[in-house]
Amino acid sequence: MVTNDELEKQAIEDRLNAATSKWSGFYVVAFLFGAALGGLVFGRIGDRFGRVKGMAASIFCYSGMSAVAYFVQSPEQMWVVRFLVCMGVGGMWPNGVALMSEAWAGASRPMLAGVIGTSANVGIFLTFMVFKMKDVTVDDWRWVMLLGAVPVFLGLLVLTAVPESPRWLADKQAHEDGDDPPEDESEKPPDEVAAWEVFHRPLLWVTLVGILLATVPLLGGWGSSNWANFWADEVG
């Protein structure tokens, strides 16, 4: 016979599981939209003030906000802080790719993007190894936020030791002198296209197909990778 205590305990567990699923979804959304906005904001900073400064600002954003996350007291606070953290993560990508592609003009851009993407996975693997040595529990998880704050030292290193993109410096100098930016045939696209033009013919269909091809793997990848752990817990 099921007692009242057991029923109450089961009801509490059901509510906690529902809340966990809800906030997990919110945190994934915060990551995706935060990264998208961060790419725009910090990408603009990189265009205006230099790739190195844009990259350093991105690192300071996600590491500094990770430190702030150590002090959160509610899921809502964590949601906001995670959004800001992910803005920094999203800002690192365009500035890093731009700096590498402009510094190594002869290298393949897809290859450089792949190197950065692979490096991110290496970081995830190293974090997993840390978790193997120290458990993350309900009562002991805030140290993970401090671990995320460690890259602030990397931001300082970027500011002091990483040289600015020679292409960006040349464009800036040409702009200050009132001259046309130096042209590099390996970097110059066949046609200069404004951002809004990709949503008009004849580029509209190409844009829509590109969005569709990017959406499908993102939905499948994020949908499966972020919910797999919760499904595994429910199964066994």
Stretches found by the model and what they are:
Residues M1-L37:
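Extracellular/periplasmic helix-loop-helix junction of adjacent transmembrane segments
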Residues G50, F71-Q77, A105:
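Helix-breaking motifs and short loop linkers at transmembrane-helix boundaries and internal kinks
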Residues F60-Q73, K132-M133:
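C-terminal ends and interior cores of transmembrane alpha-helices
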Residues V81-T118:
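Cytoplasmic helix-loop-helix junction between adjacent transmembrane helices
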Residues S108-V136, V150-V152:
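Glycine-rich segments within core transmembrane alpha-helices of 12-TM secondary carriers
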Residues R142-L159:
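Symmetry-related core transmembrane helices of the 12-TM Major Facilitator Superfamily/SLC fold
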Residues R201-G236:
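Extracytoplasmic gate region of multi-pass secondary transporters
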